[in-house]
């Protein structure tokens, strides 16, 4: 199974979750888990996404999510799950 971690950070505003999740849905990527919080006016979200049925590469998905993030005024980081875990190993 190919999975990615999608991290979204930026000023809180309506439509962020919808904008990011719609890009994932367009490419048959399945959101397995999601966590989000708002600290004052700062929005933060982490998604674990299954890409085994996706019709695009991780690189292309990253490009599209970053473009959507620019339109929404947020930063989007997309990493393979293994890379994410290696970077956050204690």
Curated annotation (Swiss-Prot):
Chain ranges passing through the membrane: none
Pfam families according to UniProt: ACT_6 (PF13740)
Superkingdom in the source lineage: Archaea
Residues of the ACT domain: 5-79
Matches recorded under InterPro entries: ACT-like_dom_sf (IPR045865), ACT_dom (IPR002912), UPF0237/GcvR_regulator (IPR050990), UPF0237_ACT (IPR022986)
Family: Belongs to the UPF0237 family.
NCBIfam families the record matches: PRK00194.1
UniProt-recorded name of the protein: UPF0237 protein MK1213
């Amino acid at each position: 199974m190919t999975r990615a971690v999608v991290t979204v950070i930026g000023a809180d505003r309506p439509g962020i979750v919808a904008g990011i999740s719609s890009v994932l849905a367009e490419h048959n990527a399945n959101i397995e888990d999601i966590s989000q919080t708002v600290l004052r006016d700062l929005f933060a979200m982490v998604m674990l996404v299954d890409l085994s049925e996706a019709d695009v590469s991780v690189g292309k998905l990253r490009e599209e999510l970053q473009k959507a993030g620019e339109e929404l005024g947020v930063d989007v980081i997309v990493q393979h799950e293994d890379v994410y875990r290696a970077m956050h190993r204690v």
